[in-house]
Amino acid sequence: MKPIIYIKYGELTLKGKNRAQFIKVLVHNIKQMLLEYHELVYQVGYDNLKIINLEKYNLQQVINDLQQVYGIAFICVAYQVNKEINEIQLACNKLVNNTDQTFKIEARRNDKSFIYDSMQIKQICATYLLQNQPTLKVDVHHPQLLINIEIKHDCAIVYGHKIPGAKGLPVGINGKALVLLSGGIDSPVASRLIMKRGISVDFITFITPPHTSQKALDKTIALAKQITLNNHLTKANLYVCNFTKLQEEIAHISKESYRITLMRRYFMRIAKRLAIDIKAGALVTGEALGQVASQTLNSMQTISSVLNDFLVLRPLITYDKQEIISLAKQFNTYELSILPYDDSCSLFAPKNPTTNPNVQTAMKLEQESLVLDAIYELVFTKEITKINLSSK
């Protein structure tokens, strides 16, 4: 009797007519995550996925990889047996690693034609365990081991501990967004949270050589790879925009306090145009309300006004910094994010950036330059490089 992996789907089971598409996307994502395990066999069910042929692989490593995939409610090590009560009993016995513990059995029949009802299945299997392992004890309220028996139409599944999945929705089921990715803590976390809601991502980052170094770009590439788990979670590209020419022109505006505001307005303009080109339906930022000068209500309104009606998603808008750091550590992006390489925002930030900008002043300052729009057009058409994260 060999173990299998038994996966229960997450939120996608609530989606009615779209169920088949949700399952298709989830199974595809699982296969992408487990691409290196060449001999695995997948059996797709209405509310579950079974993975068999695991003998050659490290079972715990497969489970660890599966825990990263959005759309999974829980994962179990299980036994798939014939619908014979003696085989079900043996499978229950396989799950008992410690004979000095309490247990409870739950049973469910999808196949109502099975000879025993749920209560009888529980009684027969519990009696078998107690006879074969006398030190076991039944505890129906707080058992140390909960054994689950599911009688399917074609087999019986027996499993114990439920390992939590990442939950959420399968990445890609809700379209694509373009993430404005910096080398900081926030935007990588925002990326993962938006992926959890079923959105695939591409990234855009802004560099200002020679003011920013190659190491700073390498850090951002490493972050993008970690966010996507080397493109196993989603097939993403990183677009690198050389912003130096625009940055140097913005540095000459008459109101230094507006420098970051104008810079971010051009970030948004460039990101929107790129998003439309790559068929992304929204932009994603790591903004958290009130965290820095450019993230007040007035600042965000002034900056995003250049987008007209184009959608901006801000998954971190209500989070405080410690919550974001905690998630960054969970996603293994934190240590990369705190590497000491400056990005374009930090290098060009004024001493006292405005926290209360307005659209009219921002537009007036942009109009001070006779060449700003021409430089913007040049940067968008000539200064964006695409990096395929699967190959670099």
UniProtKB/Swiss-Prot annotation:
SMART domains: THUMP
Pfam families named among the record's database cross-references: ThiI, ThiI_fer, THUMP
Positions of ATP binding: 180-181, 205-206, 264, 286, 295
EC number(s) on file: 2.8.1.4
One GO cellular component, as annotated: cytosol
GO MF: ATP binding; CCA tRNA nucleotidyltransferase activity; tRNA binding; tRNA-uracil-4 sulfurtransferase activity
Domain THUMP residues, every copy: 60-162
Record carries keyword GTP-binding: no
Any one GO BP annotation for this protein: tRNA 4-thiouridine biosynthesis
HAMAP family: ThiI
Entry's family note: Belongs to the ThiI family.
Name of the protein this chain belongs to: Probable tRNA sulfurtransferase
Organism this protein belongs to: Ureaplasma urealyticum serovar 10 (strain ATCC 33699 / Western)
This protein's encoding gene: thiI
